[in-house]
C-alpha cells in the first residue's frame, strides 16, 4: 500500500469514532423513467457493488444491505461481523463479501448466509467466476494468499501463498479458465509481479515483472491489461497475451498508477487513470490511445466504469467524474457533499455510496 493510501485510511479511522450511523430512509424526487433519482440513508458505508437490479453496500454495525437499483428501497439486510471495505462481488445468485479473516457468501435473492470460509488473515478482494459449469470464488488476502473456493459450499479447491502482499483486486476470465493477480515484491525489491494461473488447479501459466507503480490488472479480449510506471513519470498502459505473457501493445501514460485503481474494459476499449488524474482510453484491437483527459485530481482508489456512452471514476478529493466515452470530454462532476466509497451503474443510473456526509447515503442520479 502506498503512503498516500495509508494516510487516507488513517484519516478515515480517526474520523469514524465521532460519527453516529444514520437510520435507513429513502427519498425520491418524483420523476419517472430515465430521470428518476433516489437517495437512501445508510450508516457509514464502507463499500458498494452494483449488478443489475441490486445495489449491495457494506456498512457500520457489521451489516450488508441490498437495495433495489431502480427505487432505492431496501431488499434485505444481513449481519456479517467485521465486514471490510473491499468491494462486494455479485453474480446471478451470490453476493461475496470479505470480513476480517474470512469470506462470506450470501444468497443474492434473500441475504441468507450460504457459507463462510476462513482464509487466516486480512481478507482482501475476491471475484466470482466459473470453471466450466461450476461456480467458484477466487479470493485473496493482503498477505499474499490466493485460493479458489467452491461457489456452492465454500470448500477450498486449491490455494497458494505468494511471496508478497496483495493490494490490487484479482481478475478472472471464465471462458479462458484463467485468473490473474498482482502482488508487491519483497521489501528489498523495487518491482511488482503479475501471475496468470489456471482457475481449476492454480497451476501457473506465466509470470511477469511489473513496475512498482501499477494498477490492478483486468482480463479483456485475450489480454491482461494494466497500467505500470516507475514513479518518475515513465509510465504506460500495457497488454500481455493471456496465453503466453508476450507483450501485445503498450501506450505511454504521463504518470504512474495505484494498485487501488481497477481498469474498466468493455467492447474494444480499456480505460485506466494514473494517480495524478489523467485518464487514458485505449482501443485494444489497434493498441492505440483513443484519448487522454487530465482531470487534475488525484485518483488513488476507484473502479473505472464503462457505460454505453460514459466513463465514470471517483477521485481522492471526493468527486465522481463522468466523461464522454467517445471523446473523453468531461460531461459531469458530482460533488456528493462527502466522500464516495464506491460507484456503479444500472438502468442508465449512476449510483454511489457516500460517507462523511449529511446524511451518509447511497444515491442514484441519471447518467448524462
Each model region followed by its residue ranges:
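Secretory-pathway ectodomains
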Residues: 2, 10, 18-368
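A motif-centric signal for short, conserved binding hotspots located
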Residues: 7
Amino acid at each position: 500500500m502506498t503512503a498516500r493510501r495509508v494516510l487516507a485510511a488513517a484519516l478515515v479511522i480517526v474520523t469514524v469514532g465521532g460519527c453516529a450511523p444514520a437510520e435507513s430512509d429513502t427519498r425520491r424526487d418524483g420523476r419517472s423513467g430515465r430521470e428518476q433519482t433516489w437517495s437512501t440513508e445508510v450508516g457509514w458505508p464502507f463499500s458498494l457493488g452494483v449488478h443489475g437490479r441490486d445495489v449491495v453496500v457494506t456498512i457500520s454495525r457489521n451489516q450488508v444491505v441490498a437495495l433495489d437499483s431502480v427505487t432505492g428501497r431496501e431488499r434485505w439486510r444481513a449481519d456479517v461481523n467485521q465486514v471490510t471495505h473491499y468491494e462486494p462481488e455479485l453474480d446471478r445468485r451470490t453476493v461475496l463479501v470479505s470480513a476480517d479473516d474470512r469470506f462470506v457468501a450470501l444468497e443474492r435473492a434473500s441475504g441468507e448466509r450460504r457459507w463462510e470460509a476462513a482464509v487466516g488473515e486480512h481478507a482482501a478482494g475476491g471475484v466470482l467466476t466459473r470453471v466450466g459449469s461450476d461456480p467458484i470464488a477466487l479470493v485473496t488476502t493482503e498477505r499474499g494468499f490466493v485460493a479458489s473456493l467452491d461457489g456452492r459450499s465454500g470448500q477450498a479447491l486449491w490455494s497458494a501463498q505468494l511471496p508478497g502482499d496483495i493490494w490490487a483486486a484479482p481478475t478472472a476470465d471464465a471462458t479462458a479458465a484463467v485468473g490473474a493477480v498482482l502482488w508487491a515484491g519483497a521489501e528489498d525489491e523495487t518491482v511488482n509481479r503479475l501471475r496468470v494461473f489456471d482457475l481449476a488447479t492454480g497451476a501457473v501459466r506465466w509470470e511477469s515483472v511489473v513496475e512498482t507503480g501499477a494498477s490492478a490488472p483486468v482480463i479483456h479480449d485475450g489480454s491482461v491489461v494494466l497500467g505500470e510506471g516507475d514513479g518518475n513519470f515513465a509510465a504506460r498502459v500495457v497488454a500481455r497475451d493471456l496465453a503466453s505473457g508476450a507483450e501485445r501493445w503498450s501506450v505511454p501514460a504521463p504518470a504512474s498508477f495505484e494498485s487501488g485503481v481497477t481498469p474498466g474494459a468493455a467492447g474494444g476499449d480499456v480505460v485506466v487513470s494514473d494517480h495524478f488524474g489523467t485518464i487514458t482510453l485505449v482501443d485494444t484491437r489497434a493498441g492505440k490511445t483513443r484519448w487522454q483527459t487530465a482531470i487534475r485530481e488525484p485518483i488513488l482508489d476507484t473502479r473505472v466504469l464503462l457505460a454505453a456512452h460514459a466513463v465514470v471514476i471517483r477521485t481522492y478529493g471526493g468527486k465522481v467524474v463522468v466523461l464522454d466515452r467517445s471523446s473523453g470530454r468531461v460531461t459531469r462532476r458530482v460533488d456528493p457533499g462527502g466522500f464516495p466509497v464506491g460507484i456503479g451503474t444500472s438502468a442508465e443510473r449512476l449510483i454511489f455510496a457516500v460517507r462523511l456526509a449529511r446524511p451518509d447515503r447511497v444515491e442514484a442520479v441519471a447518467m448524462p
